[in-house]
């Protein structure tokens, strides 16, 4: 929910995640990255701050954490007073090991409102270990897309997996085949009995 008088500004990070999640609706945005840079993103952040100084910023992609130094530059461009959300698969790599992720959240804990971490019933990307999620210094929420033939009978175990860390879970439907014409159709929608 956006604060009164504000707006939600979605910031597509200017680098591709190199993942291939089948439900991703942003991949085509990265086919032609011309004119897409950290500097341009910072210009846009400053412009939106001038237009709507109470706006929320949502970093998504791509994968915001795949280039941590660039993400920090963009975070530093956001003036105080804005809520900041990061949508991520939270990859752990040699470039961004667990200790560095924890340090990033510690350094930005007064700026980050919540990190929304994608976890799914079927694995599509390399995931960090669950213990790391409980060690982050900012609020965390798990986002789970109920994509195609996800295992219904595994939902309780999936929820329990994160319950021990006190992490809320948002289940959402797969939007990749949603059109204005079929938006309210429930027949054949495997997620409608659950959602």
Please annotate each region the language model reported.
Residues 1-43:
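Canonical Radical SAM [4Fe-4S] cluster-binding loop centered on the CxxxCxxC motif
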Residues 38-41, 70-71, 126-129, 155:
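Aromatic/hydrophobic pocket-lining residues that form the small-molecule binding cavity
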Residues 41, 71-72, 97-104:
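Leucine-rich repeat
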Residues 43-52:
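A short, N-terminal amphipathic alpha-helix
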Residues 69-79:
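N-terminal active-site wall of soluble small-molecule enzyme domains
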């Amino acid at each position: 929910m956006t604060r009164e008088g504000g707006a939600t500004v979605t910031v597509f990070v200017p680098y591709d995640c190199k993942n291939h999640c089948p439900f991703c609706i942003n991949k085509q945005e990265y086919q032609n990255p011309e004119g897409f840079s950290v500097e341009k993103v910072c210009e846009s952040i400053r412009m939106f701050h001038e237009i709507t100084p109470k706006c929320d910023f949502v970093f998504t992609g791509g994968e915001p954490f795949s280039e941590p130094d660039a993400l920090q530059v963009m975070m530093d461009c956001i003036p105080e007073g804005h809520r900041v959300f990061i949508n991520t698969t939270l990859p752990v790599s040699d470039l961004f090991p667990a200790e560095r992720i924890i340090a990033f959240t510690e350094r930005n804990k007064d700026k980050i409102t919540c990190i929304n971490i994608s976890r799914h019933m079927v694995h599509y990307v390399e995931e960090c270990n669950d213990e790391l999620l409980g060690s982050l210094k900012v609020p965390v929420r798990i986002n789970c897309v109920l994509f195609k033939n996800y295992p219904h009978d595994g939902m309780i175990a999936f929820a329990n997996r994160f319950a021990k860390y006190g992490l809320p879970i948002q289940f959402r439907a797969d939007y990749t085949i949603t059109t204005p014409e079929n938006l309210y159709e429930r027949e054949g929608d495997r997620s409608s009995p659950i959602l």
